[in-house]
Amino acid sequence: MCKVLIADDSEVMRTAIRKMLREESSIDVVGEASSFAETMQKIADLKPDVLLLDLHMPEKRDFKPALVKSQLGTVCTVAVSFSNDTDSKALAESYGAVTLLDKMKLYNEMVPAILRCESRESDIGSLLRKTFKRKAHAT
């Protein structure tokens, strides 16, 4: 089960996203945040696998991308925005997002993006297990 945290300042968007994700049995929405500060706290408390991050929350100017990226740790970040321009893409990259999704196309793109994050983590976990097995057999 892939644990997802939704971070968006719009309650309407958070509700819509939660309803869309409810249809996917392999995804569990573990929480919601309406600000960057609340997002950072919920990441620490809830330990989600994936963060759906609205790039344009009002107080984003108070948060430096490098700081946010370092606090995200191993959380796979999927950025969402109504604008898909060069500046938004650059901001998404600065936060370490694996992709930027257009909010107008979320229904078709969101679940596949989340599942790609989950499979990436599974691939990494599988690779680590194989590596440790080889090392154990070599000793």
Where are these regions (language model features)?
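Hydrophobic/aromatic residues positioned on beta-strands within the core alpha/beta folds
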Residues: 79-80
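Two-component/phosphorelay signaling modules centered on CheY-like receiver
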Residues: 11-31
